[in-house]
Amino acid sequence: MASNALSSFTAANPALSPKPLLPHGSASPSVSLGFSRKVGGGRAVVVAAATVDTNNMPMTGVVFQPFEEVKKADLAIPITSHASLARQRFADASEAVINEQINVEYNVSYVYHSMYAYFDRDNVAMKGLAKFFKESSEEERGHAEKFMEYQNQRGGRVKLHPIVSPISEFEHAEKGDALYAMELALSLEKLTNEKLLNVHKVASENNDPQLADFVESEFLGEQIEAIKKISDYITQLRMIGKGHGVWHFDQMLLN
């Protein structure tokens, strides 16, 4: 009955005659036919659908075989307890330069903390500058912690290096302590920027786009903003000299 219906339907519609699904001579998979009768607009239409059982057909054109790919040596999972499971495409040079940058950030933070302590003295009493350098110290320490977290994410090992003891006096007979400290801060920010660019360079040399992206997105833009802000402060301090204007500048930072 179904065969007669299909023959009648294709005879009346030669353009819809079924085409061979496989090239001549190929193994024939099992084909099942389904028919349905739809009524609409005063017409009855027989719809035929064919499905091919491909269970017995060879798979061709496979481009990704996960169970074979994971057997590659660089994807092997370490079995020793001291080895990182997360580490992948993370060069020793990248690990080392991150530890160096952690040390840079902590050293700069330490200098800023010394500046904060100086300007917070009762015989200096520049609360605005003290606030600015305390916030700067906390920011640099936060940068060090970001690098430590990233080191752990990539499977590296954080190694903290010694921190140099900073100076504690910032008096300067010619410039005054505010301008002298701010110029020192600008030098530190430019030095930090150079060190960050070196981290980015090492990442590029070792084909590590993830480390390069981390430095770009988290630090480089922020660093040039800090350089511009401190440069503006230096220009203002140079204009007002060592007199009463320094107090007004300090109040501006405080408020």
From Swiss-Prot:
State the EC number(s).
Answer: 1.16.3.1
Q: Which InterPro entries match?
A: Ferritin (IPR001519), Ferritin-like (IPR012347), Ferritin-like_diiron (IPR009040), Ferritin-like_SF (IPR009078), Ferritin_CS (IPR014034), Ferritin_DPS_dom (IPR008331)
> GO annotations under biological process?
flower development; intracellular iron ion homeostasis; iron ion transport; leaf development; photosynthesis; response to bacterium; response to cold; response to hydrogen peroxide
Superkingdom of source: Eukaryota
Stated induction or repression of this protein's expression: Up-regulated by iron overload treatment, and by H(2)O(2). Up-regulated by the phosphate starvation response transcription factor PHR1.
What Pfam families does its record include?
Ferritin
Q: What class of enzyme is it?
A: oxidoreductase
In terms of SUPFAM superfamilies, this protein maps to: Ferritin-like (SSF47240)
Which residues are involved in binding Fe cation 1? 105, 140, 143
Q: Where is the Ferritin-like diiron domain?
A: 88-241
Task: Kindly state which reaction or reactions the protein catalyses.
Answer: 4 Fe(2+) + O2 + 4 H(+) = 4 Fe(3+) + 2 H2O
Say yes or no: keyword Iron present.
yes
Q: Which GO terms describe its cellular component?
A: chloroplast; chloroplast stroma; chloroplast thylakoid membrane; mitochondrion; plasma membrane; thylakoid
Give binding positions for Fe cation 2: 140, 189, 223
Which keywords, in A-to-Z order, does the entry hold?
Chloroplast, Iron, Iron storage, Metal-binding, Oxidoreductase, Plastid, Transit peptide
The subunit field of the Swiss-Prot or TrEMBL record says: Oligomer of 24 subunits. There are two types of subunits: L (light) chain and H (heavy) chain. The major chain can be light or heavy, depending on the species and tissue type. The functional molecule forms a roughly spherical shell with a diameter of 12 nm and contains a central cavity into which the insoluble mineral iron core is deposited.
User: What family does this chain come from, according to its entry?
Assistant: Belongs to the ferritin family.
Protein name per the record: Ferritin-1, chloroplastic
Record the organism.
Arabidopsis thaliana (Mouse-ear cress)
Give the source lineage, highest ranks first.
Eukaryota, Viridiplantae, Streptophyta, Embryophyta, Tracheophyta
